[in-house]
Amino acid sequence: MAIFSTAQPLSLPRHPNFSNPNQPTTNNERSRHISLIERCVSLRQLKQTHGHMIRTGTFSDPYSASKLFAMAALSSFASLEYARKVFDEIPKPNSFAWNTLIRAYASGPDPVLSIWAFLDMVSESQCYPNKYTFPFLIKAAAEVSSLSLGQSLHGMAVKSAVGSDVFVANSLIHCYFSCGDLDSACKVFTTIKEKDVVSWNSMINGFVQKGSPDKALELFKKMESEDVKASHVTMVGVLSACAKIRNLEFGRQVCSYIEENRVNVNLTLANAMLDMYTKCGSIEDAKRLFDAMEEKDNVTWTTMLDGYAISEDYEAAREVLNSMPQKDIVAWNALISAYEQNGKPNEALIVFHELQLQKNMKLNQITLVSTLSACAQVGALELGRWIHSYIKKHGIRMNFHVTSALIHMYSKCGDLEKSREVFNSVEKRDVFVWSAMIGGLAMHGCGNEAVDMFYKMQEANVKPNGVTFTNVFCACSHTGLVDEAESLFHQMESNYGIVPEEKHYACIVDVLGRSGYLEKAVKFIEAMPIPPSTSVWGALLGACKIHANLNLAEMACTRLLELEPRNDGAHVLLSNIYAKLGKWENVSELRKHMRVTGLKKEPGCSSIEIDGMIHEFLSGDNAHPMSEKVYGKLHEVMEKLKSNGYEPEISQVLQIIEEEEMKEQSLNLHSEKLAICYGLISTEAPKVIRVIKNLRVCGDCHSVAKLISQLYDREIIVRDRYRFHHFRNGQCSCNDFW
């Protein structure tokens, strides 16, 4: 039977010493009140006990008071505010009470308060810090990622002769890893004379969390060689390391180790095993484990969903989501993210719309970032705007990820001004926010502004990363800033400590080639310290198409196909160069080779968003419900353009077509023309027509878009594979340099 009733106030007997609370507490009285404290199951009961202790004088006993305070500070119903009041009533808090206060603050919402409590302890009491004090202070330093504070506490622990204590040392290892100082963590680990399993776990999990999974596995091997018995925490860390580096063989060995050594397999460890199998691509092993698990939580279901998504079995992933006993936002996010990251943005948006129909399901930052990325890919500006409004309406914090995603979405959907507005609205910007804005400027051909922003970023004491440089080089490429790109490239390692990767080399080749410096681009490739990749040769091949350099094109294509024989893009590019030069026999031969080998040219596809719906058009497409009206508008537009001096650029026809009239008809069927015409019949001025194309816009379509913008007084924005084109009053923002 319960001692306390949760419904009724606690009934305590009148104490005979009520009139004299300062009378010394007997052992029986102390034991009785400590028993009462330990039986409390609510804050209300604890406060009743507190009041009785004050009335009876028991609270003046430091030991009893400290026990009451510990329950107020650390129990499941703890209240830091109440605990502090209890602490302040203790006449002379002992070391246990001070350490309890420090521990409570270190585990609370504001860990820095534990440091202030520590300072009060050393300045206001006769108590000295001991081996129980420092672990929680060091934990607070780790929580706020303050390396300097951690180092200071380390020094104080050494001076207090507890620096080598295993509990203190383990806390220091965790703190140094949390602050990114791996070397100091390793030094502390080596100084521990009698390492316990927590010491090893702290190192293994620290390496995993800080991106050194290989070191984690090496340390586990050493741990095993020293006959240290691993715990389930060890196994979780090791399996996470295997998952990160996709080491299925080692992961399976770990699973065997768990079975052979009878390691306790709780739900956390089972989920780690499942995660390892899915991340390593062994969906069969994952399915067997999943089916065998008697206990499952949402992490289990979401991990399995992720596994199917990784293996591109989206039907099975959907089935897992539908079968979940309780679908949470994490599961929905997993499916949206899986589609978005694997080139299926339309499917990601479909899932997002399903999520919107769910009751009591609150969107979080992860949901919004993934969905904004999908919007960016397909050009869903209206949905992106809705998400931005949702963020404002619901007070969702604009962290760096959300800010970057918004900037990226607006930029890729053609609204650069809105990107600037979002960028300027935030005071704190990290490297990803700066890089997103630089990338947006690059896509829209604002090369000089992008380079200026690169330097402003450094003035703001934000160090660029590899993505930043990629975006700056793209900006230079679209604006012809060759000298600036070369200068920044040579500064990457010397000034910024960033070793150029293959994508950076490809960017410089693109900068040189696009500006006509083909021979210089070849010499640059020959001087590369790493083997040229397909992206490098692809950049050179693309430049050869622009400048019709057949000899270099054939060489670049040969090198590219040596690395990736089934690269359809390389075949198409070379075929287009042959066609541009009138070498139709070569075109025929290359197209025949593609048919025989099963290679297919990616069809031209353009999309346009009208009233929140994405409408797609393929070249020569008749599938759209309004195709008849679209083609009627196309005929009207082309006739109007011809009457104003337009002549089709039949040199842009890259198929083998004999009759001039058929060549002209072929040009008219390009997907971007269809999308623009649909925009003309579906919207009215001054609404901007925004079109997204998957391939490079051809010269004829470029000329047509300029003329339409002039003759119909419409602003047209086209995003092709490489950049944006803003058509206004018969002119394009690219100045015909693309």
Curated annotation (Swiss-Prot):
Sequence segments annotated as region (Type DYW motif): 643-738
Region (Type E motif): 536-611
Region annotated Disordered, chain positions: 11-30
Keywords for the protein's UniProt record, in alphabetical order: Chloroplast, Plastid, Repeat, Transit peptide
PROSITE patterns reported for this sequence: PPR
Location of the transit peptide in the chain: 1-42
Effect of inactivating the gene: No visible phenotype under normal growth conditions.
Residue runs in coiled coils: none
Protein name, per record: Pentatricopeptide repeat-containing protein At2g29760, chloroplastic
Annotated organism of origin: Arabidopsis thaliana
Lineage summary: Eukaryota, Viridiplantae, Streptophyta, Embryophyta, Tracheophyta
Name of the gene: PCMP-H33
